[in-house]
Amino acid sequence: MASSVGNVADSTEPTKRMLSFQGLAELAHREYQAGDFEAAERHCMQLWRQEPDNTGVLLLLSSIHFQCRRLDRSAHFSTLAIKQNPLLAEAYSNLGNVYKERGQLQEAIEHYRHALRLKPDFIDGYINLAAALVAAGDMEGAVQAYVSALQYNPDLYCVRSDLGNLLKALGRLEEAKACYLKAIETQPNFAVAWSNLGCVFNAQGEIWLAIHHFEKAVTLDPNFLDAYINLGNVLKEARIFDRAVAAYLRALSLSPNHAVVHGNLACVYYEQGLIDLAIDTYRRAIELQPHFPDAYCNLANALKEKGSVAEAEDCYNTALRLCPTHADSLNNLANIKREQGNIEEAVRLYRKALEVFPEFAAAHSNLASVLQQQGKLQEALMHYKEAIRISPTFADAYSNMGNTLKEMQDVQGALQCYTRAIQINPAFADAHSNLASIHKDSGNIPEAIASYRTALKLKPDFPDAYCNLAHCLQIVCDWTDYDERMKKLVSIVADQLEKNRLPSVHPHHSMLYPLSHGFRKAIAERHGNLCLDKINVLHKPPYEHPKDLKLSDGRLRVGYVSSDFGNHPTSHLMQSIPGMHNPDKFEVFCYALSPDDGTNFRVKVMAEANHFIDLSQIPCNGKAADRIHQDGIHILVNMNGYTKGARNELFALRPAPIQAMWLGYPGTSGALFMDYIITDQETSPAEVAEQYSEKLAYMPHTFFIGDHANMFPHLKKKAVIDFKSNGHIYDNRIVLNGIDLKAFLDSLPDVKIVKMKCPDGGDNADSSNTALNMPVIPMNTIAEAVIEMINRGQIQITINGFSISNGLATTQINNKAATGEEVPRTIIVTTRSQYGLPEDAIVYCNFNQLYKIDPSTLQMWANILKRVPNSVLWLLRFPAVGEPNIQQYAQNMGLPQNRIIFSPVAPKEEHVRRGQLADVCLDTPLCNGHTTGMDVLWAGTPMVTMPGETLASRVAASQLTCLGCLELIAKNRQEYEDIAVKLGTDLEYLKKIRGKVWKQRISSPLFNTKQYTMELERLYLQMWEHYAAGNKPDHMIKPVEVTESA
């Protein structure tokens, strides 16, 4: 605030006394300017006693008393000056200063304005008026006051800088910038303007320009404390920590007891990972300023990082005692409560932080994250959007919102969020990892691998990224450093389990790695506990369950829960089961977790179940569970486990008295809320029951089932063309299938019936033989027409009124037949030439996804191919990017590239049908073909397997045991190779085994859905009777076998 000291008026006394008076006046002025107010007052009083009416002396006395905060005395002398000269603008201005200091702003403003009316070019008056208007909240008026001052003197660089400050405060950054630049133009060495300009650039996000201007300010004024602090702050934000430390240390050399600078310096130490130094520096800041909530909050952050959570919690609470509305402390304390599992308190604190500070982006994001974990996705999304609205460059919020959108199945939205997060912060490892997960789920594996590698480069200790990268590399069969990778992955899981953290390996992937059974079970258990955490916040009381069947008219109500009622392998397996239950004893409910996909698979289940409920329309797990409970379900069946689309929270709420795992997930749930796992003796031997959290409930033959007889009845029979006419009949070179096959064959001349002998499916497979009749079409004009259709790539021809179609063209003829939704109505021709398979070689095949192959499996297959020289291995491009890796590893093992033939993934019907062309299927021991095993067996192709220790590695053995083909089950690697080699070199033996599989698929229980349903019903009744008797779940490993006529 400018005080006007005035000029000493001319004296009428003689010259000698006048000189003495003038000299004393100048001395008083100099003392005033130097801040020696005591001496200035003493000399002024001498002057006043000599000339009591001298307005210059009166103004100087007014200013001296004002500086000494003797406001009444200051006002007194200003008033005396006005009495002497009512037009003295400076006196009114000085009086205005007194009023302003007393808080009487309107009186101050009136006096300043009066001074300016008296003296329109009074610069100090404008400056004082501007300050008073700012204090009164009239910012625009203050701007005009500064502008008026500058109109009278454009070279007032200090005033122009002050105007810039005001414009900056109003958010008018470009105008502020212009002011500072003009001030610098007027006075290039004006350090304050350089510093202020740096603040503008910082506010505009021009970090490097800000740094440059702050550095210029401290160069011009090496003792400019605020500029050093500003420089340190912007360097801290730019993460240039060493230079930030230097700036703060220089500031402390100028002001050693500056608590805020100590606090900021501690923040830099914290970011540098110098936690102990940060803690010490925060403590120094608190020592200097005990009522410093920011320092307590930041100290708590450092203590938490060090693991001193209890002490950190105390510090947050201290900060809140000092300032109950300290939003950062509320937010950070909420984070601790969340990590402690006290979710309700965390939510309360986040909401309190937002109540205090609605524009708190981090609190919005954190609250959203908790809401997402609770399954409240829409509310979470709302808070993420708020966080981003408040802070458009909040990369974490974008990344986390992407996670929510991903969970809501909005893949494009999630992709955009992750991409934006990375644009904002290219070094954001979590966002790269999240982006990778979207690519992975979308099947863009190379992009996923690249993003995971970027994440790990940015953050080497990143278990989630490492384990997901390992899975991606498994998918494409990239086995570089395979053994080392497996060791590291196991050690990551061990460390996470020891620290009670959620493992980075997903339960569904755990079967692929050399983990112990205990680890696999613990991984599943952690995921089960997550479901419990989500439902705990609902505060739902336990459901009461019936102990009898009175309310259901004596019928057992079974509820099947799945996200896969549609075009999905699970429906391909079980779609007929709901409609085959005995309606007198069972009432069937199917609960869909996914919307209608418009396929016949969905239509069939909807039509044949007694009740079909689309729970995808009830996103709230509590309400969905209520619906299940209201339906009075006795046995609730989980067909998802931890596969995509699961809602295990429904089971965690226990809406049914008995809950069982079945079919859709190849492992234990690890969850206390699942009572049984429906399995069989071969898949889950009783001696490994400890692998499962559930009790084992055995089916008498196999827990696996396939609806192939219903979906693909046209493959029950086949005919072949004797294309070589050399007396050797091949059953899998040119194959014809069709519902009308017999009628078509009857219309042809010269069709021969060849009897193929095959062993029975008893315990002793070689004890007796039965004959199978296989129609053979000789090479004639009709056969030639069929072969010409294939060679020319024609879609379809007509022979004797029958439509004969090219097996590669099913999607063009009838797409629903291609997907397995309808039975093809044409005669379909399938040939080895369609897939580039050699006519005169043994074809081994495997139609699994490539992730099921590991180095030891490929080595076994290479050994087999070497021992069977005239043989090839037929695999799928599943995915295509895995093909070059497999080929390269095979070449390293001594196999030429032409020994492995890849085909694209095919529609379901073609996929099953073309399996007839292979001679032998080689199963993957790591994780068997489950649905694909059923597919290849329905095609009549023998499958060699070697059961391991996991459920996923024993399913094929269970299928083969049910089929009666024990000779195809190996006990070890050598036996696996020997069985495959015998099939490839002993063609008579191969023919017998192929005949056996062809026969047994019809006569064994493996594809008998009616018998399977009856056995499943018997198991359900066992479970119910056990429960109704008041017993806890127990193993049911003595299944009651039933026959179809039972």
Curated annotation (Swiss-Prot):
Glycosylated residues (UniProt): 3-4, 399
Binding site for UDP: 849, 852, 906-908, 911-914, 930-932, 935
Record motif Nuclear localization signal, residues: 487-503
Record-listed Phosphotyrosine modification sites: 989
Metabolic or biological pathway, per its Swiss-Prot or TrEMBL entry: Protein modification; protein glycosylation
Superkingdom of the organism of origin: Eukaryota
Extent of motif DFP motif: 464-466
GO BP term, example: chromatin organization
Keywords (A to Z) from UniProt: Acetylation, Biological rhythms, Chromatin regulator, Cytoplasm, Glycoprotein, Glycosyltransferase, Lipid-binding, Nucleus, Phosphoprotein, Repeat, TPR repeat, Transferase, Ubl conjugation
Record PTM N-acetylalanine, positions in chain: 2
EC number: 2.4.1.255
Phosphoserine modifications at: 3-4, 20
Gene Ontology cellular component list: cytoplasm; histone acetyltransferase complex; nucleus; plasma membrane; protein N-acetylglucosaminyltransferase complex
Region: Required for phosphatidylinositol 3,4,5-triphosphate binding, residue numbers: 991-1010
Signal peptide (residue range): none
Modified residues (Phosphothreonine): 454
Renumbered ranges of TPR repeats: 21-54, 89-122, 123-156, 157-190, 191-224, 225-258, 259-292, 293-326, 327-360, 361-394, 395-428, 429-462, 463-473
Quaternary assembly: Monomer; may exist in different oligomerization states in cells. Homotrimer, oligomerizes via TPR repeats 6 and 7. Trimerization is not necessary for activity in vitro, however it increases affinity for UDP-GlcNAc. Component of a THAP1/THAP3-HCFC1-OGT complex. Component of the NSL complex at least composed of MOF/KAT8, KANSL1, KANSL2, KANSL3, MCRS1, PHF20, OGT1/OGT, WDR5 and HCFC1. Found in a complex with KIF5B, RHOT1, RHOT2 and TRAK1. Found in a complex composed of at least SINHCAF, SIN3A, HDAC1, SAP30, RBBP4, OGT and TET1.
Family indicated by similarity: Belongs to the glycosyltransferase 41 family. O-GlcNAc transferase subfamily.
UniProt domain comment: The TPR repeat domain is required for substrate binding and oligomerization.
Protein name: UDP-N-acetylglucosamine--peptide N-acetylglucosaminyltransferase 110 kDa subunit
Organism taxonomic ancestry: Eukaryota, Metazoa, Chordata, Craniata, Vertebrata
